């Protein structure tokens, strides 16, 4: 086809088209810019809103802070006001309290003043009444003081009464009573100098009597009893004469205990102690002591004399006026002291002996021993109740360091081979007896171990074996002991020595003969084929070859009935399951039964030595948590069985929280 040519456009048209296109492009660009501006505006607006909110929050916070400060200031001011008011309140309360105190003190003063005024009035009235009574009693005193024979004229008495009444009326109120009394009436008091002197004498006398009483307990006084009583009588007679000259009959002349003590203890001059007639003391008569008091004082005196027979000065002084009573008491005290001199000495000796015994018992007594024995019925036989308790062996291996002490361990942990307690008690008693004999003996000292060995070397009694720690050591020790026993028996039985070749032949013959005799005698079915077993078993041949030195021929019995003696190590080397070993053991038992009438103790422990390398189970110890084989077989290390695993799988389907089957 022929291509049609497009019409050509003019230059202007093309320019217009280009302009239009450019305009469209601008519009599009503007539209795009407008959309971008819108998004930016929204973002800016969001940012502006957040900032404004923050500003608002800050403003609010500042306002709140200011308000809080203002309120705090107000509260502080209020608290200050409250404190000020409280102070004022306390001050007012204190003032009120002080005012109340003043009021109470004023009221008390008023009452005290009123009481004092009333008391003064009462005292004035009493003094007035006393003066009146004194004036009335003056003529009666004059009547009493006048002589008994001379009776006064009534006119003189009336004159004296009238003069005394006029003197009383003229006296002032403040005059003392002692001034108003006449000179003949003596008051019941001494002058101060004489009173002080008498008090001093009494105090010294009391001190001296106390010293004499203390000294009389420890040592004898050198003064004699008769001089003491005579001195008492002299004092009493002098007092009687002087008082009769100065005092009337109705005035008592009895002295107190203190004045008597002055006479007894102090060697004071009687002229100084006696008072003139003008200054004598008028005392009201006191009743004599009752019978009860006198009896009590006598018993006290007797007790004192018994306690201190060597002190004759210690006598109870009674306030009696008569000297005869004092002498009688002194003589009674002397008689009782002479009678009871020997009795307190015997009592003292007994008391001293009892005290010494108590001290010795208290020193010997131990703190863990009971002071009182337990009460038991007499009907019970105490000897039967007492049981022989085996004494505990002392641990002699103390301070031995870290080494393992077999003897100490054996004494603590008793093995099953030590269950025969009777033999132990017998051995202990024999050891105690031997030790006591050894102490008394003057022979040479032998150690304890030698004695025990010599006692245990009897052929009939087998030694009690200790608990073996290693099998080889025990086998070696047993073999040595057996060899020693055999050598002793051989020396006693036959002193001749036989060569090895002769021993081989005789041992083979005797061994076969003994087997035949044992087969005839025995009733056990297991020991019938012993001869065949011995003939066929090569170990027995080796045994018979090896233990030539151990076989001993006993010459006490005839050669046909002779039995071989084999050492313990050869027996233990045989295997445990062979019939030969059983046969040899039975032969040993039979031979021992023949020799000793008492049945010998069978061996409980058969030691077999195996020289093969021990297994793990043999090396492991029972009870040791580190090497115990049973501990490894505990449920922790066991493999779980199928049943347990199935049960656990079935149970695992269930949830712990929700009890239901999982699907």
From Swiss-Prot:
* Listed Low complexity bias regions: 427-437
Gene3D superfamilies according to UniProt: Single helix bin (1.20.5.730)
Compositionally skewed regions (Basic and acidic residues) per UniProt? 231-242, 280-304, 339-358, 366-394, 443-453
- Extract one GO BP annotation from the record: meiotic chromosome segregation
Note the InterPro entries from the entry.
Shugoshin1/2, Shugoshin_C
- Mind telling me which Pfam families this protein's record contains? Shugoshin_C
Which chain positions lie within coiled-coil regions? 8-29, 110-132
**What's the domain of life for this entry?**
Eukaryota
Q: Describe its PTM? A: Ubiquitinated by the anaphase promoting complex (APC) at the onset of anaphase, conducting to its degradation.
Q: Where in the cell is the protein located?
A: Nucleus; Chromosome, Centromere; Chromosome, Centromere, Kinetochore; Nucleus speckle
Q: Listed disulfide bonds for this chain?
A: none
Q: Where is this region: Disordered?
A: 207-250, 278-401, 417-478
Q: Which UniProt keywords apply?
A: Cell cycle, Cell division, Centromere, Chromosome, Chromosome partition, Coiled coil, Kinetochore, Microtubule, Mitosis, Nucleus, Ubl conjugation
Which Gene Ontology CC terms are recorded? kinetochore; microtubule; nuclear speck
Report the function annotation for this chain.
Answer: Plays a central role in chromosome cohesion during mitosis by preventing premature dissociation of cohesin complex from centromeres after prophase, when most of cohesin complex dissociates from chromosomes arms. May act by preventing phosphorylation of the stag2 subunit of cohesin complex at the centromere, ensuring cohesin persistence at centromere until cohesin cleavage by espl1/separase at anaphase. May regulate kinetochore microtubule stability in mitosis, possibly to sense tension on mitotic chromosomes.
Q: Report the sequence similarity comment from the record.
A: Belongs to the shugoshin family.
Per UniProt, subunit arrangement is:
Binds microtubules.
Q: What is this protein called?
A: Shugoshin 1
Species the sequence originates in: Xenopus laevis (African clawed frog)
